[in-house]
């Protein structure tokens, strides 16, 4: 079983390496994570919101310490990422706190920017904006012959929205901008939102409705 496990692990590493060759404009969400890894300090706490684009982090962000990955425990709690990200920073103010969101999930709880600013909680929220509800659109593509209902979004610029609340706002349009932008947001020691425009991504196996 050890050799089988090692074979699976090696295939994963090969797949992740192959993703570094992706080139798209707007970028694919897979292109975000190698660049994010360059900016995350050791021991950074990462909260992963529900959704397709942020969910890619499970396979692409390497967590080497306990209590550094936080998620919704499979309960489909869309939008929990922002509030939980703030909580991780309050619990461990000495650690970097980053939360990963799709645009749909972030819209659920972005009003908590008011909380972050009032209490000066320096958590960094990264919004992968593909202008849709990714999981639901994947289901409709797979199960309803691409008949889409209620899944496409018209969003604000989330970096500008953050600035309206008094937080820091950043925009990273190209993969080469991500690492420096994340590092700058962390260094600001202030509540911050980074918008990254990405393409829609439909997983090979669409999420199944329950």
Residue ranges and their predicted role:
Residues 4-83:
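Active-site diphosphate/adenylate-binding microenvironment
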Residues 36, 48, 87, 103, ...:
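Hydrophobic, well-ordered secondary-structure elements that form the walls
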Residues 44-46, 95-97, 123, 190-196:
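Generic beta-sheet signal
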Residues 50-54, 130-132, 198-202:
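Glycine-rich beta-alpha junction loops
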Residues 55-133:
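Thiamine diphosphate
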Residues 67-71, 108, 137-150, 167-168:
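Short beta-alpha connecting loops at secondary-structure transitions
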Residues 141-143, 160, 175-210:
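Glycine/aspartate-rich loop-and-adjacent alpha/beta segment that forms the canonical ThDP
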Residues 152-154, 169-174:
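Short acidic-hydrophobic, aromatic-tinged amphipathic segments that line or gate anion-handling sites
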């Amino acid at each position: 079983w050890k050799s089988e496990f090692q074979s699976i692990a090696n295939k994963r590493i090969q797949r992740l390496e192959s993703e570094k060759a992706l080139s798209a404009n707007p970028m694919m969400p897979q292109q975000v994570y190698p660049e994010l890894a360059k900016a995350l300090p050791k021991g950074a706490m990462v909260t992963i919101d529900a959704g397709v684009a942020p969910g890619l982090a499970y396979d692409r962000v390497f967590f080497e310490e306990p209590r550094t990955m936080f998620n919704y425990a499979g309960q489909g709690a869309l939008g929990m990422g922002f509030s939980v990200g703030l909580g991780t920073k309050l619990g461990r103010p000495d650690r970097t706190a980053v939360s990963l969101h799709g645009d749909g999930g972030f819209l659920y709880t972005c009003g908590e920017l008011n909380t972050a600013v009032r209490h000066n909680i320096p958590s960094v929220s990264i919004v992968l904006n593909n202008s849709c509800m990714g999981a639901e659109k994947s289901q409709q593509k797979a199960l309803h012959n691409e008949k889409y209902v209620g899944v496409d979004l018209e969003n604000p610029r989330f970096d500008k929205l953050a600035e309206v609340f008094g937080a820091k706002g950043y925009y990273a349009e190209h993969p080469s901008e991500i690492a420096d932008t994340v590092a700058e947001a962390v260094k600001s020691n202030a509540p911050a939102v980074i918008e990254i425009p990405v393409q829609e991504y439909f997983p090979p196996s669409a999420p199944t409705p329950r």
